[in-house]
Amino acid sequence: YKFVAEDLEGTSPKFDVEDAQGVRWKVKVGQETQSETAATRLLWAAGYFTDEDYYLAELKVNGLPKLHQGMSFVSAGGTVHQARLERKSKEEKKIGTWGWLANPFLNKRELNGLRVMMSLLNNWDLKELNNSIYEVNGERRYLVSDVGATFGNTGGATSRSKSDPKDYASSKFIGKVEPAFADFVQNGKMKEVTKHIP
């Protein structure tokens, strides 16, 4: 892999690389790498559009300079540890974001299924910025494009976690069940996303 540029947006260290075939990848390091890769696999298996993510325990990057953040994941010779690679398709163009409470799929079972999946994954970062609309060959695809804040505890600012199997295993899942709907436990942002799901 060849270093292209550092991405300073967001809270997780990220940079772009290019492989030998000329394919661009967004590399993310840090706490979210394993949880995000696992979450995208589960969402894809359930039939939802996702980013194409892969986890590599080690990744050799040629020409890697000193990064503004994330150097604790880099060792001598440009070896990056605990990396998530997200494929950047030339056919895919981001055209916007979508909100949980305002989108073309309100009251549809597919959106309700996605709401259940967010609960199952314990995704506590459900802000609109993490939901993308991509255009691929004239087709619009709506997806949750950042699922790194998963597999932990959905608690408040001081008690929430991500990529923590122990916290995930001990967290509550179902809050309330009625004949026509269920409420799932969500202590993070956008609690209403996981409430009153038919």
Positions of the model-derived regions?
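Detector for methionine-enriched segments
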Residues: 71, 117-118, 190
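Conserved kinase catalytic-core segment
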Residues: 35, 41, 93-163
